Amino acid sequence: MIEKAYAKINLSLDVLSNRDDGYHNLETIMLPLELHDTLAISLLKQSTDDFVTCDDFNLHIGKYNLCHKLIESARKKWGFSEHFRVHIHKNIFLQAGLGGGSADAAATLRGIIKLLKINASKEELIELTSQIGSDVPWAIENKPCVVKYKGEVLEPFEFNKKWYVILVKPESGLSTQEIFNKLNQDGYKPMYKIDKIKESLVNDDINTLKENVFNILEGPAISILPEIQDIKNQLSKYPKGLT
C-alpha cells in the first residue's frame, strides 16, 4: 500500500508557556505543502517484528523512529498482532522544521488502518498521535489549521489564495530540542498574533500578513546557526514574498 506523507510549514509560531511535562504550550498556523515523502506499507505475515527502512541513510530508523513508535502505540490501542514493513522514499528535508517525521508517522497510521480495516474516529486518531509527537495530530488532519497547546487542539480553516513556497535549508540542520532549549535559556514573550494572521490569510490581506507573520523560534535558531540570517538577507532582496 502506498501512502503520501505531506510536509508542512509553520506560517507563524508562538510559544505561550512552559508545561509541567517538559513540552511547551504553542499556538501556530500550519499549512500543508505539495512536497511529500512516499511510504510503501505492507503486512508481514510470518514476522515477529516491524521493519522501517528509508532510502536516505541520514534518517534514524531504529526503535525511536516515530513510525516505530506509532506502530507500537497502535498495537497497544487496538490489540492487533500483525507486523509491518514500512519503506520511506524521502523527499522532505531532515531537521528543517517541515514535519517530515511526523508526516511519515501519520501516513504509517493511515496505512495500518486501511490494511487492517480498523474503524477509528478522528478523535481517536488525534488522541493516539498526540502521544507520539506534537506535529503528528496535524499530519492526520493535513489541512490549514490553527494548532494549539501540545498539538492536540486543531482548528481547521480555509483560504482561497494559492501560494508558491521557496524552501531553503542550510547544509547543517537543527533539532527541535536544541532550539527549544535555547528559547528557554534566552527567555521569551508570547506575541499573541495568530488570530490576526489567520484573518489576513482568510481575507487575502497580504499587507497585514507581511506585517505580522513571525516565528518565535527564529531568534534561537539563528543564534545557533547564523547562516539562517544570511539566507533571510538574500531572500529579502525579493520584496514580493514573505520571509
Residue ranges: model-predicted function:
Residues 1-96, 114, 118-123, 159-160, ...:
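ATP-binding N-lobe of GHMP and related small-molecule kinases
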Residues 28-30, 136, 152-158:
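A generic local secondary-structure boundary/capping motif
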Residues 46-60, 108, 130, 205-214:
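Short, basic/glycine-rich phosphate-binding loops at helix/coil junctions
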Residues 87-116, 134, 241-243:
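Glycine/serine-rich anion-binding loops at beta->alpha junctions
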Residues 105, 109-146:
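Contiguous, small/hydrophobic- and glycine-enriched helical/loop subdomains that border
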Residues 141, 146-241:
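Conserved, helical-rich catalytic subdomain that frames metal- and/or nucleotide-binding sites
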